[in-house]
Amino acid sequence: MVLFSEDHIQETRRRGRIEVICGSMFSGKTEELIRRMKRAKFARQRVEIFKPAIDTRYSEGDVVSHDSNSISSTPIDSSASILLFTSEIDVVGIDEAQFFDSGLIDVCNQLANNGVRVIIAGLDMDFKGIPFGPMPALCAIADEVSKVHAICVKCGQLASFSHRTVKNDKQVLLGETAQYEPLCRECYQRALQEDREKS
C-alpha cells in the first residue's frame, strides 16, 4: 500500500492565462475582479492591480465597485506602463479595460506568455451597444471569458445593455448610478426608440 505518492503532488510552476470578466454596468464585473484578486492574495500570490488614471469616480488610487468594495490599485495612463510594474508579479488585475488603448492586447499576451495570470474586467459594449475599445479582442485571446449580467431595471430580466439616462453623446462618460441603467435587449431597444423620439 502506498501512503504517499509524488505523482499526486500538485505542480506549482506558474502558468499564464488571460481571464476576462465582461458585461453591462452594474453587473458585478469589478466585484468579481476584486474577489479573484483577494483570493490570489490570500494564497500568498504576488498581485498588482491597474486601472485607467481617468477613472477617479470613487477613489484615485483604489479599484472600487458600485457596492463600495475596494482593493488598492495603481492608476496608469497607458497600457504599456503595466509592464513597468510586473517583473515579480504572479497575478495582474486590470479594471475598466475598455478605457485602455489597443496596446493592452499585446501587454496581456506578453504577460500570460511569461507565466502571469491576467484578470481583466470591463464593459463589452458602450451605451450605443457597440463593442467597446480593446474588449472584443481581449475576449478573443482570453483563455476564459465570464459574461456577467445585471438585472433590467424595467422588467427584471437579465440585462446585457447599459442605457445612458443623460443626454450626452461622448463615448466615454464615467458613470455612476444616476447616469446609466442596466436593461435587457427588449427594454434597451424601447429606450433607444424613446430617446430618438425626444431628440
From Swiss-Prot:
GO terms for cellular component: cytosol. InterPro entries: P-loop_NTPase, Thymidine_kinase. ATP binds at residues 23-30, 95-98. Zn(2+) binds at residues 152, 155, 184, 187. It catalyses: thymidine + ATP = dTMP + ADP + H(+). Belongs to the thymidine kinase family. This is Thymidine kinase. It comes from Bacteroides fragilis (strain ATCC 25285 / DSM 2151 / CCUG 4856 / JCM 11019 / LMG 10263 / NCTC 9343 / Onslow / VPI 2553 / EN-2). The lineage of its organism: Bacteria, Pseudomonadati, Bacteroidota, Bacteroidia, Bacteroidales.
